[in-house]
C-alpha cells in the first residue's frame, strides 16, 4: 500500500524564500490567525525586529488591519487557513470598493489528500467565493513555483492595486490526515 507522509512545514525552505521575498518588497506587517500551514512564516515574522507580527482575534480583522497598514504607508499580508476565509468575506467588500492593496496567503484545507471531512466545504468554496468578492486568486501546488507566483501576486496587489489571494495547496504544504 502506498503511504504518503505529511510534509514538515517547519523545514520548508520555500516558506523562508517567500518570507524573504515579502520583506524585499517592503512587506512589514504580517497579520495572522495561528495555523500550521503558516507556522514557519509566522515564526519568522515574530523573530524579525523590522517586521510586525499581528495576531488576529479572527480572520475578519485581517482586511481592516491591511487598510490601516496602507493608510499608514506600510505594506502587509494576511496569513489564514481556508477554513477561516468565510469569516472575512464581508470585509473583503471594503478592500475592493476602496481599491486598497491587499495580499492574502491562504493555506488550503479540503483539497489534496485531506483527511478531515469538516474541511471540505470551505476548502472547496474558497476560490469561487473570494473571486466573487473581486479578489484575484493564484494557486501554488509546487515549491519550485512559489517565488515566481508570490512575486506576481505582490506586484499585482501593491503596484496594480488589485487585491490578490495566493492559495497554498496541500500538495505544497503537505497532506493533513486530521
Predicted regions span which residues?
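Thiamine diphosphate
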Residues: 1-178
